[in-house]
Amino acid sequence: PTNISVEEGNNTFIIDGGWVVNKKTNTLFGAVNVKQNKTRTVIHDLPNYIDHIGMYAFSYCIDLTEITIPKCVVSIGESSFDQCEKLETIALPSGITSIGVGAFGECTSLKHIDFGTDVSYIGTAAFFACINLATPSFYKTKIEIIHGNSFWGCNQFRTVEFPSTLNRVEDQAFAMCKNLNTLVFNSDQLIIENGAFTYCKNLRRLVFTKGKPISIGTTMFNEDGKTPDGKCFITYLYDTNGE
């Protein structure tokens, strides 16, 4: 559809300043004028009371470069900014707890994002192929699982330090991060699945500050289960005691 309308007396949805909002959950679903929204470059007029950005709310807004997220927002929905190719930076409110599946997938111009301290969930492929994204500050979050393909192809990542809450890194979570060099893990209950860092050709150093992981997949780096791709051997694999 090119336009969305809400009938008078609707008990669930309202239109507020050109935006469609579920008034029961304070979820923003998108713009009334869908076609016009796809061509906007800057958005600073979202309702200031919304708590959630809904699924696909801004997906394929290929000209969007900048958006202000209201301070009370706590979750970014599935594919909400999928393929916003020109979006360069986004400031997430400090209270954000959840970033949905594919939320920023293929935002190829995205350079910076700050998770804040309350994020505990990042969905599968949330930042898939964000090839210009600088390494976010994972360390201060409450993330427990890095889901598959979450950061596939994030080529600007170099050193990543994970929070003590992390207990699992899933298959392909950081695959194709070609410049990733160092990983620092701060958990004593860690499982790294097969292929979690496949094709990370420059990965050289792993640090486990709380001792050895519970499990490391046999093909963590490469399909042969022996060495990282390109035969770039890991030069350090130790805990804080050097063991």
Regions found by a protein language model. Name each.
Residues 1-19, 23-52, 62-75, 85-98, ...:
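Structural signature of tandem-repeat unit edges
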Residues 30, 54-57, 77-80, 100-105, ...:
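Consensus positions within tandem repeat domains that build extended binding/scaffold surfaces
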